[in-house]
Amino acid sequence: VDTCVKMADLILPEGVVVSMKDKDGNVTEEKIDDEYYDVPMAVLVNGYSASASEILAGAIRDNHAGLLVGTKTFGKGIVQSSLEFADGSGMKVTTARYYTPSGECIHEIGIEPDVEVELDEDAVTRYGINNLPHDHDAQLQKAIELLGGTPVLTTATPDEADAAEEK
């Protein structure tokens, strides 16, 4: 959460990034100051977006600081603490829930994008989610379009770039 709040401090106006409410109703808020980069923003989200990335996505949405593009997020909005016992065993205990600046609990619900765009499952299967070429990533292309930019071309390796220059 600390890294999420630091990132939010760079791109969001002053206010609450996330609040946490424990079982007794005690609320803790993470706030940021008013110095930030006010730039157009489109943030890609999907079912793999969970926890801190959902907190940041919710703060961006609630502050009207950018558009969320993709599919619904995972929905992990709980704070867990690890307990270790003398015998070496341990367990995780849920101690609180995360809430977006507007007060929305995202646990087991997720966050809906502003613009829904599915990924091409054939491309994901072929390349893998982390190696999807830019020109096969419909979510990225839609985000670029929404920002008024030029579509991103597939990145060439240094050898491919050198070969293209020689032609």
Predicted feature locations:
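Sec-exported extracytoplasmic/periplasmic mature domains
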Residues: D9-V16, S49-A50, R61-A65, I144-V152
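C-terminal recognition in membrane/secretory proteostasis and scaffolding
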Residues: M20, V117-K167
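Gly/Ser/Thr-rich loop/hinge elements
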Residues: V1-S51, I78-E84
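Extracellular/periplasmic catalytic domains that process cell-envelope and extracellular macromolecules
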Residues: D34-D38, R61-D62, F85-D87, Y99
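Conserved P-loop NTPase
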Residues: Q80-E84, M91-T125
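Short, well-structured beta-strand/strand-turn elements
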Residues: N63-K76
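Terminal peptide-recognition signature
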Residues: I11, M41-L44, I60, G103, ...
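Stable alpha-helical elements in mature extracytoplasmic
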Residues: T3-M7, A52-L56, A65, S102, ...
